[in-house]
Every structure is written in C-alpha cells, then in structure tokens.
Amino acid sequence: TNFGGVFRKANPMAAGQIAFSDYRQYVPSYDAPASFIGSPIYDDDQKIGVLIFQMPLDRITEVMAVRDGLGESGESYLVGMDHLMRSDAFLDENHSVVNSFRNPEKGELHNPAIDEALIGNSGIMTTSDYRQVSVLSAYMPVNISEGVVWGMEAKIDVEEAFASID
C-alpha cells in the first residue's frame, strides 16, 4: 500500500527528512484516494519510530475551490502526473478526485496547459478544456516531493474573459 511505501521510504531516513506517497486508491479507506507523508522520529541519535499521517484531501480541494475572481466559468485545480485529479474541478463532477480515481477513463484530464505544467513549465495560453470549450488558461508546476510534480491550472472561458463590461 502507499502507507507501507511511505514507511519503507521514511524508516532509513535521517532526522528531518520526509517521505511522500502520491495519491492512489487505498483499500483500508474503501478505495478512496489517499496520500501519506512520513518522517523518522529520533530521540537524540536513537530512532524511536516513524510518524506517518494521511494528507487531508478535503483540505486541498477546499483551498483550490476558492473562486474569487474566476467569474461564472472559471475554476482552478491540481492534476497528478497520472493525469488524475488532485483537487475537484468545479464544473464537472467526473473530474473530482474520487471520481477520477474510480473511473480514470472519464476522470483523466489531458490538455496542453496541464501537459506543460507537468513537464515543469509555467505560462498562459488559450486552449480547449475538458469540456472542449475555448479557455484562457494559466498553468504552473507544483513540486510536491522529489520526483512528484502536480500541474496547477486556473482557467476561464474565453467568451467570459473577453466579454465587454456593461
């Protein structure tokens, strides 16, 4: 499991180092996506254990769900290297974290902005989103841990972004 993987990574680490396991379905949580962070605990030079905690998926989604300045059609979200959601999309329930892991065929998110973010690029572009709607997109990589990058995208429909103000 990803819990066990974090333990195996964290157990041999020096004090102050952190192990991370990206989101995957986790059987003890009824196959809900789960991610873990772990670190060895030392008393002076003696390792006394490994502390592991589950990343709060709802808190990540709560932060990403802030819609200030995004108008009616805007949204922002995080996507993992597997193209599955790491926060819920606002406009389509298929693109929630839980649904994207349970049904990857419908929940995977592929678009040029996310592809660019996942290879380490930041920028702004006009592209089509998962609804096949033309959007103005700002994107960037989020370096979560060594070897783990999530793509972040904030977007709004081009029609709304360039609409005249009445």
Language model: regions and residue ranges:
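Solvent-exposed, extracytoplasmic
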Residues: V6-K9, Y23, Y42-D43, V50-N99, ...
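Extracellular/periplasmic juxtamembrane segments that couple receptor/chemosensory ectodomains to their
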Residues: I41-G49, M81, E93, F101-D166
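Solvent-exposed loop/turn segments at secondary-structure junctions
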Residues: Y26-P28, L57-R59, E160
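Extracellular/periplasmic catalytic domains that process cell-envelope and extracellular macromolecules
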Residues: P12-M13, Y30, D43, G69-G71, ...
